[in-house]
């Protein structure tokens, strides 16, 4: 999710190489989760909770879901219930995989990971509240493209 990469860029100094490495790691985790039980999202979330005190489900529940739904529905017309379930599942999976990679690969401290999660929630709130200023997901993607040279292929047509 570009929002997570944007937060890492703004607040933790991640550049192109680290963002791409994180994205690849998350994709590898997703592929491995298909065949390895210890790589399933629920297993990794339990590891984060028990070993590091990071309760991903609790953190996801703190995300202002109504705001996230409105942001998402600006470009994706789905029913509220479909959108809510999709976003909840996506946010849970992404946050679990990202936090696992940030801890194990990038050696971020628990404090830094908790800050990342809080900043992620704050960015969602900002996107929702300040829509009148034109801060949108495609603009976040454009910022990553311009400043970090990271391009999310989902936004190529939107940006051009």
Regions found by a protein language model. Give the residues of each.
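Intrinsic disorder/low-complexity detector
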Residues: 1-8, 37-104, 133-160
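Amphipathic alpha-helical segments that form the core helices of the histone-fold
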Residues: 22-33, 114-127
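Short, highly charge-biased, low-complexity peptide segments
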Residues: 129-131
């Amino acid at each position: 999710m570009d929002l997570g990469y944007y937060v890492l860029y703004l607040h933790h100094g991640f550049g192109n190489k680290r963002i791409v490495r994180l994205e690849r790691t998350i994709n590898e985790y997703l592929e491995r989760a298909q065949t390895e039980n210890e790589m399933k999202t629920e297993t990794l979330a339990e590891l984060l909770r028990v070993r590091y005190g990071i309760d991903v489900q609790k953190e996801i529940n703190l995300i202002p879901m109504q705001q996230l739904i409105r942001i998402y529905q600006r470009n994706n017309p789905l029913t509220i219930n479909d959108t809510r379930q999709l976003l909840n599942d996506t946010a849970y999976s992404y946050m679990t995989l990202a936090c696992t990679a940030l801890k194990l690969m990038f050696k971020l401290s628990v404090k830094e990971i908790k800050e990342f999660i809080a900043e992620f929630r704050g960015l969602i709130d900002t996107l929702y509240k300040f829509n009148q200023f034109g801060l949108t997901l495609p603009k976040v993607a454009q910022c990553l493209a311009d400043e970090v040279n990271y391009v999310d292929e989902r936004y190529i047509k939107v940006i051009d």
